[in-house]
């Protein structure tokens, strides 16, 4: 529905939650892309220790993700979860500067566990809860979720360049900016009125909201061969790629005259890539509708394999910049392809549980195991040799997935 056709309250909610997405993903971008750089340069962690931190974050994401999904479904349009995450984000700078960093330098395991709890709650688990809540608000207030979500891409892209510049001056500046923007999130939550209309409540009562996780549907999935075929792809391709990307920033900045210059360029490339990602995301549903979800996942796997293997042979800054930009082509095919594959290859009632177990939890569980091992490999054989091994793994599993993923001759609507 057009913005002009919305009621005043609905129009206000559209604006409030568009801004909420912008500032939330701005804050997330202050953490995620440059986190391995912060661990290495500020806290002097080895690549093995960095892998341990990532493993802990994934571990606590596994613990909290299902819990927050259930709580989110129970709360509906009430703002309790968003208030909790906003308060925790206000503490972003104090936590990183006065708690997380000293703990990491004093005891790596204590720091990894405490940081894993905080980051696993605020970002790895809660980002899904934020997305689900605002999607629910969009249905209750008759505006399109996708139009609101684009502002998150813009916030992420803008912060990447700012952080790349400020990191060379003082990383703490970015953390304080993030905490300040979290205060704005609080104001936006305070003024928003996301209560649904009567008709929306009826739709909600009829089960239009996403199905909650249940052990019965999980057990039904485990008996399906096509479920395990999908798991093979997620664990062998998508999960390995995520672990590869965790410390790519440290590899990237090594190709420049100084680490500071490398960090700045990494920020600019991330910004350009994120804007390109948003553009491709608009086109991806129509493309995937034409080629099919299985082929979309295979193309994503091929792009991931090319990027990892290409990185193992990269010798110049230009090459790593081009390889970094490939990430923005892979993401739309992976995300949209996953949703379309789930909807075409499985029963509708299984889709939510399948996405939770088959995609999110399996990726996080794989990351718990792989992150520390890959970090250790970086320290022992170096980035190039490790990337060659990881690239061969993803390429092999992409080929295997050609036979284990289920194809579908039925084309889906061109909406993600």
From Swiss-Prot:
GO molecular function: lactose binding; lactose:proton symporter activity
Topological domain ranges for the Periplasmic compartment: 35-50, 102, 245-267, 375-384
Site residues by UniProt (Substrate binding): 131, 149
Residues carrying the site annotation Proton translocation: 307, 327, 330
Xref: InterPro entries: LacY/RafB_perm_fam, LacY/RafB_perm_fam_CS, MFS_dom, MFS_trans_sf
Source species, domain of life: Bacteria
Catalysed transformations (reactions): lactose(in) + H(+)(in) = lactose(out) + H(+)(out)
Cytoplasmic topological domain residue ranges: 1-13, 72-80, 124-149, 192-223, 289-295, 338-353, 406-416
Site, as annotated: Substrate binding and proton translocation: 274
Pfam families documented for this protein: LacY_symp
Residue pairs linked by disulfide bridges in the UniProt entry: none
Any GO CC annotation of this UniProt entry: plasma membrane
Keyword annotations: Cell inner membrane, Cell membrane, Membrane, Sugar transport, Symport, Transmembrane, Transmembrane helix, Transport
Keyword Cytoplasm: no
Transmembrane annotation, as ranges: 14-34, 51-71, 81-101, 103-123, 150-170, 171-191, 224-244, 268-288, 296-316, 317-337, 354-374, 385-405
Main localization category: membrane
Membrane topology: Multi-pass membrane protein
UniProt subcellular location: Cell inner membrane
Family annotation (NCBIfam families): 2A0105, PRK09528.1
Function: Responsible for transport of beta-galactosides into the cell, with the concomitant import of a proton (symport system).
Entry similarity comment: Belongs to the major facilitator superfamily. Oligosaccharide:H(+) symporter (OHS) (TC 2.A.1.5) family.
Protein name as annotated: Lactose permease
Protein source organism: Klebsiella oxytoca
Lineage of producing organism: Bacteria, Pseudomonadati, Pseudomonadota, Gammaproteobacteria, Enterobacterales
């Amino acid at each position: 529905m057009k913005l002009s056709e919305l009621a005043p309250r609905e129009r206000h909610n559209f604006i409030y939650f568009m801004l909420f997405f912008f500032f939330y993903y701005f804050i997330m971008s202050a953490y995620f892309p440059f986190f391995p750089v912060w661990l290495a340069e500020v806290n002097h962690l080895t690549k093995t220790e960095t892998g341990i931190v990532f493993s802990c974050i994934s571990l606590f994401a596994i613990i909290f993700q299902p819990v927050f999904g259930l709580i989110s479904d129970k709360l509906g349009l009430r703002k309790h979860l968003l208030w909790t995450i906003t308060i925790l984000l206000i503490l972003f700078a104090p936590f990183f500067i006065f708690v997380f960093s000293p703990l990491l330098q004093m005891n790596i395991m204590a720091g990894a566990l405490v940081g894993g709890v905080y980051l696993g709650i605020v970002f790895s688990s809660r980002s899904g809860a934020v997305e689900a809540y605002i999607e629910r608000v969009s249905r209750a207030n008759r505006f399109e979720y996708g139009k609101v979500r684009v502002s998150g891409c813009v916030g992420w892209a803008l912060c990447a360049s700012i952080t790349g510049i400020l990191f060379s001056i003082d990383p703490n500046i970015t953390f304080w900016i993030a905490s300040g923007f979290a205060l704005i999130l609080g104001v936006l939550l305070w003024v928003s009125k996301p209560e649904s209309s009567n008709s929306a409540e009826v739709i909600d009562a009829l089960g239009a909201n996403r199905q909650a996780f249940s052990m019965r549907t999980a057990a039904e999935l485990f008996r399906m061969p096509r479920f395990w075929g999908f798991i093979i792809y997620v664990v062998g391709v998508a999960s390995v790629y995520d672990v590869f990307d965790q410390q790519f920033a440290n590899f990237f900045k090594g190709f420049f005259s100084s680490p500071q210059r490398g960090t700045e360029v990494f920020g600019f490339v991330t910004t350009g890539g994120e804007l390109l990602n948003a553009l491709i995301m608009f086109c991806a549903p129509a493309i995937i509708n034409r080629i099919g979800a299985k082929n979309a996942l295979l193309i994503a796997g091929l792009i991931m394999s090319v990027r990892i293997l290409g990185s193992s042979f990269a010798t110049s800054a230009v090459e790593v910049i081009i390889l970094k930009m490939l990430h923005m082509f892979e993401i739309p095919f992976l995300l949209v392809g996953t949703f379309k594959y789930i909807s075409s290859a499985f029963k509708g009632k299984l889709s939510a549980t399948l996405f939770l177990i088959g995609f999110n939890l399996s990726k996080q569980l794989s990351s718990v195991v792989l992150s520390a091992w890959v970090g250790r490999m970086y320290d022992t054989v170096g980035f190039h040799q490790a990337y060659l091994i990881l690239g061969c793994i993803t390429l092999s599993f992409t080929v295997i997935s050609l036979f284990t993923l289920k194809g579908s001759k039925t084309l889906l609507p061109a909406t993600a």
